[in-house]
């Protein structure tokens, strides 16, 4: 079976055959895809917490309440739900930050949360609890089984499109409507 190139800095789009799973109509940003496996963050499944409520949980006083006022925290995936991951742009210099591509970074440090509370963090953020993970080769097998479509990174999809529209918009970038999708793979 032929293996796909690295999917880092791409999006996965859930296919209709995942409707009975945790990943129903999800879009996932792939943070890492290497010889150890794949790690991604769901960018369109909302948690019941908002960003200000999360900051309050850490006893951080929000000095700029208009920042992120109604922004929901997202469910990044079913793994490690008590850990937070923040995708943001620009990258900046945070304590525990992983620079990605296109001036995007993922940060997991409290100094970023403090910057969010005091209004000095970047405006473009996506806050997730938990992540999605696959063992080496597992995601490639799922793509071959027609569980996922892939598209390159798109800043607007990550930061600007409303969460409830991201799946549809992601499909539209491929010229696909949900009604035209089949659950059958197009190969043997």
UniProtKB/Swiss-Prot annotation:
Alphabetized InterPro entries for the sequence: AlgH-like
Assigned GO CC terms: cytosol
Chain segments annotated as transmembrane: none
Recorded coiled-coil stretches: none
One Pfam family it belongs to: DUF179
Family recorded in the similarity comment: Belongs to the UPF0301 (AlgH) family.
NCBIfam families: PRK00228.1-1 (NF001266)
Protein name stated in the entry: UPF0301 protein Tcr_1827
């Amino acid at each position: 079976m032929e293996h796909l190139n690295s999917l880092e800095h791409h999006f996965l789009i859930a296919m209709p055959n995942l409707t009975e799973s945790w990943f129903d109509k999800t879009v996932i940003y792939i943070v890492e895809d290497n010889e150890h496996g794949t790690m991604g963050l769901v960018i369109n499944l909302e948690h019941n917490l908002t960003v200000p409520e999360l900051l309050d949980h850490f006893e951080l006083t929000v000095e700029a309440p208009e920042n992120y006022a109604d922004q929901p925290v997202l469910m990044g995936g079913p793994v490690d739900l008590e850990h937070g991951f923040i995708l943001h742009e620009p990258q900046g210099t945070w304590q525990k930050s992983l620079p990605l591509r296109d001036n995007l970074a993922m940060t997991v440090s409290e100094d970023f949360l403090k910057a969010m509370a005091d209004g000095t963090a970047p405006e473009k953020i996506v806050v997730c609890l938990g992540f999605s993970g696959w063992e080496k080769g597992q995601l490639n097998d799922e793509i071959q089984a027609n569980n996922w479509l892939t598209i390159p990174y798109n800043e607007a999809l990550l930061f600007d499109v409303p969460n409830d529209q991201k799946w549809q918009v992601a499909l539209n970038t491929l010229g696909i409507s949900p009604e035209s999708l089949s659950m059958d793979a197009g190969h043997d």
